[in-house]
Amino acid sequence: MDPLRRKQAEMLFSEYNRELAKVYDKILDDVKSEVDFAAPDFQSMLQNEVFNCLQPWFSKKLDGLSEDTPEGFFDSLITLDDTMEVFSIAAQMVDGDLPDLLMLRLGAFGEEASMRLLELAMAGEWIRGEGVEDNAFRDGILIHMAALRILGLWNIEMALDPVLARFLNIDAPDELVAESVRDFLVPYGEVVVPRLIACLDEGSEGGLVGPYEYLVIGLTEIGKENASEEIFQCLRRVFRSMEHKVIASVCLGDYGDGRAVPLLKGYLDRHTHDVDRQFFYETLSAIKRLGGDIADITDPFRDFSSKK
């Protein structure tokens, strides 16, 4: 890509960030109730509103662009090499979701684009090197993690096995890597469920620590939209095997199947004086979310003893 086009891309994404911030501010200023913020579909509504409000901006003249408008700039990307370079610039600069017109342009190259994205995702260093600061490490993998998330959004099935294999080889994944892998997995929905269940069953003897914790969270998110007996039974097994049971407890509460109440209450009853404060209260919250009664649960920390 020639230096002028690169400079124009950088300018475009700077302006995109400004417009994106204005759109978010306007939408959020119109939300007056905390109840609205807490609504289950709020994030989905927000994304749709942002998408709709941004559309006119792409067809407006932007000084400094040879093609006059952002839409014209993206349409002018003829080669995959140029489009990938613009994608890399966007991944480093854009504050929120990448522009849809850029994603459409990239998607127009079909399987070749998917292969390039997979190569880019796998080329990054997923483990922070010794002496490398967290921020420097994360800045260095922004492009690779953006490619990973796009592969998930596009449901590129050939990416699943290599990504899972690499992730599960990381003992203590960085938060950005872990969240990117989760964001990669969730859009696949029920397609990826058998793989996740198999991974969790295989990792159960090791206590399901590190990367497995994020697979549990991802499976739960998928299960909220694609509930199945297999997912519920897997989460039950995870609770019994998991070293950090607070994660499994929260996930059972989030998944929403009331059959988990006896499991959670039974565990609290048997381990009243063994559990820590965080686990106890997160599990109480999970039981309540599942419709269970907590009045008969002994409070080992006596925070509510006066009410009993």
Model-derived regions, located:
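Amphipathic alpha-helical scaffolding segments comprising HEAT/armadillo-like alpha-solenoid repeats
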Residues: 80-90, 111-133, 156-169, 190-203, ...
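Basic amphipathic recognition helices
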Residues: 40, 243-245
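Short coil turns that connect the paired helices of HEAT/ARM alpha-solenoid repeats
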Residues: 89-96, 123-130, 134-139, 168-176, ...
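Structural detector for internal amphipathic alpha-helices that build alpha-solenoid repeat scaffolds
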Residues: 99-112, 131-156, 165, 175-191, ...
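Eukaryotic acidic, Ser/Thr-rich intrinsically disordered low-complexity regions
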Residues: 265-308
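Generic detector of short, well-ordered, non-transmembrane alpha-helical segments enriched
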Residues: 49-54, 143, 216, 244, ...
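N-terminal alpha-helical modules
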Residues: 1-94, 98-132, 144-146, 162-166
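Short, solvent-exposed linear motifs at loop/edge-of-secondary-structure regions
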Residues: 46-63, 140-141, 153-155, 254-258, ...
